[in-house]
Amino acid sequence: FDMGGTSTDVAHFDGEYERAFETMVAGVRMRAPMMRIHTVAAGGGSVLHFDGARYRVGPESAGAEPGPACYRRGGPLTVTDANVMVGKIQPEYFPRLFGPGGDEPLNGDVVREQFAALAARIEAETGDKRTPAEVAEGFLRIAVENMANAIKQVSIQRGYDVTEYTLNCFGGAGGQHACLVADALGITRVFVHPFAGVLSAYGMGLADLRVMREHAV
């Protein structure tokens, strides 16, 4: 379970890696062995929307620039901001790397202001009165459901009992949601790697270099 800023990638492991030898990337057929990975547009930078009737998470992403609203660069509300709103991300524990000059802390105040404005808008348009934190929790539930459904596609829908597995979690945003995703699936064990935030890069550095060439005869 690899949750980054733009998307979440999931794969199944049961004693061996599952590989695909032919896949489509941007409409182009690729014939090369690669991990069988299922991807959904749910990441820490996924933009939160209210369309007048329902909440939506993504598929648009704020990316690293401007990034989430809490980055102090004028970005929109995102999944990361929802975690700030509910207290999972506490700005005082993060380095001062944000803002236009890269020397300011995460901005919790702007997150609370924007969620308060969004809660007021939702009440005005629907009559549904919720606190800003409840609005943020609603968006997080949708994001968790999207990620849980992705895991179901590589497990339950293929006949595997996901409750017997350990959820191996990494990626910059994975630890914020791993337990909620596990609860949604009935998984009782979660493993968060010590290098979770940089594990993909770490793995690339340790990977063997392999070249495959094909020639039609």
What are these regions (language model features)?
Residues F1-V217:
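N-terminally biased helix-coil "hinge/interface" segments that flank
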